[in-house]
A protein has these predicted regions:
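Conserved catalytic alpha/beta cores of large enzymes that bind or transform nucleotide phosphates
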Residues: 17, 25-28, 75-170
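Short, small-residue-biased leader/transition segments that mark boundaries at the very start
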Residues: 1-4, 168-169
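Extended, Lys/Arg-enriched charged tracts that mediate electrostatic binding to polyanionic substrates
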Residues: 6-73
Length: 170
């Protein structure tokens, strides 16, 4: 129902703000010498677009853009930034997974695909999808309660990779 969806959203937002009091968050603050009173936080709600396969929902693609490129290659410049793209949810990128990385000013200059050996070793092999079996269950502070980490071969088997199709929002 609409009311239960609103409550789940409200609980999720409260959970994000409460996370600053978690042990890991406090340890991070201490390790980085950050002061909690000077920290800022925001919650961004984004529509997830992709396709459903049984009890799994495959987000089409995720990306993280950074304004600085700390490791420019060739004629790239630090101020041109970088983009990391991945199949599935952005958690894979944020968690440090192997993703496609490039400078938006040099989109055809991708080190990871320059040689077959590098491509096989340094490209994405896993990704996150939404596990719809937990849809509608009570909110959990565990950020993985409704996620599955799958091998890219699963997406290929389900038909998510290799053919064009219409995306539907979740």
């Amino acid at each position: 129902t609409r009311r239960s969806s609103d409550l789940m959203l409200s609980d999720a937002i409260k959970g994000v703000y409460a996370s600053v009091y978690f042990r890991d968050s406090k340890a991070y603050m201490q390790a980085t010498s950050n002061v909690i009173d000077q920290e800022k936080m925001a919650v961004i709600l984004q529509e997830v677009v992709g396709n459903q396969y049984g009890d799994r929902y495959y987000p089409s693609m995720s990306g993280v853009a950074r304004s600085l490129n700390y490791y420019p290659i060739g004629d790239e410049k630090a101020e041109e930034g970088t983009v990391n793209l991945a199949l599935g949810l952005g958690k894979y990128i944020v968690d440090g997974g192997m993703t496609l990385r490039f400078s938006p000013y040099h989109p055809h200059q991708i080190l990871q695909t320059s040689e077959m050996e590098i491509a096989l070793k340094e490209t994405q092999t896993r990704f996150y999808v939404l596990d719809l079996r937990n849809a509608g269950h009570d909110f959990s502070m565990d950020d993985g309660f409704n996620l599955l980490k799958l091998h890219v071969k699963e997406a290929e088997k389900d038909g998510e990779i290799g053919r064009a199709h219409v995306r539907t929002p979740v």
